C-alpha cells in the first residue's frame, strides 16, 4: 500500500516559491492499477517522484506498507527503491547495450550472480514477448518493443510497485493498446501494484481500477474509474471524459434536429444491470408516450455495462413529466438540450 498523507512539495525558483503538489492525501491499495491524470503542470510527475524519494515532501509524508519512506536511512532507501520499478515516456534505454544487456543492468548493479542474471533475463524476455530480440540493440527496435524492454528492465529486481511516467505518450494507438495489455498482465500475473500518470483518459479507461484527477498541484477528484466516468463532479474531469466519450450530438446534428421540429433532449445514464433492462420502453409505454434515441451507446467499463443515451419524448406534456419523474427514481436523467435554446 502507498499512502500520501497531506503531502506538499514546494520548489524555490530564484526568489519565487512554487507549490507543485498541494496537500495531497491518497491511498493506493496493494494490487491496484491507480491512474493519476492531469494536464501539463498539474503536479503529476512531482507526485510520482515522491514515492521513491527522488523528490522529498516539503510537508506531509509518503508511506509504503506502513513505513514512512522519508525517514529511511540511505541504505534502507536503496533497498526500498529496488522494489520500485519505473518506466518512462522516452524509454531511457542504453543505446550501447543489447536488449538482454539493458534488462540485466539493474541485476548486475545489485550484485546478482551471472547464472541468476541469465535465467532472469530469459524469463523476462519471454514474459514481454521479446525472446527473439535478446541480441538486438535499441535502435533496431520499434517504439513498442523499446517500451517492452523498459518494462522488462523495471521488473528485473522483482519489484512490488511499478511506476509508469507517461509510458504510452510516445506510442501510436495500436502500440499503446498492446503496452496497456502488457501492463494489465504485469498486474494480474505478478500481483504488482501499478501507479501511472497520464494526460490521456483512454489509458485510465482501459486499465485503471481507480483514478485521481490533478489540477494546479491538487487532487480535485478521485475514486474508482466506473463512478468517476459515470458521475464526474469536477469540470476538469468532465473535460477529460469528453475526450474519449462524446456526450452530445454535434452542433450540426443539433441544428438539424431543431430545424426538423425536434423536442427537448434528455441524457439517460444506465449503470450495471440497468443498462440491459427495458426501462425506457416499459415506462413510456405505461404513459402512452413515444421515445426516440437520438444518440448514445452502451459499453463495458470495469467489467460493468454503462449506457449513455440521448433521447426525446413525444406525446402529452403532462405524461412526459410523469415519465421523467418515474425514470428519476431508477436511473440518472437530465435535460441537456432545449428546443427553445
Swiss-Prot record:
Residues of the signal peptide: none
Single GO molecular function: ATP binding
Origin: domain of life: Bacteria
Kindly give the PROSITE patterns that the UniProt entry links to this protein.
ABC_TRANSPORTER_1 (PS00211), ABC_TRANSPORTER_2 (PS50893), METN (PS51264)
Q: Which GO terms describe its cellular component?
A: plasma membrane
Q: Name one Pfam family in it.
A: NIL
**Which keywords accompany this UniProt record?**
Amino-acid transport, ATP-binding, Cell membrane, Membrane, Nucleotide-binding, Translocase, Transport
- Which CDD domains does the record associate with it? ABC_MetN_methionine_transporter
Q: How does it assemble?
A: The complex is composed of two ATP-binding proteins (MetN), two transmembrane proteins (MetI) and a solute-binding protein (MetQ).
Name the UniProt record assigns to this protein: Methionine import ATP-binding protein MetN 3
Q: Which organism is it from?
A: Oceanobacillus iheyensis (strain DSM 14371 / CIP 107618 / JCM 11309 / KCTC 3954 / HTE831)
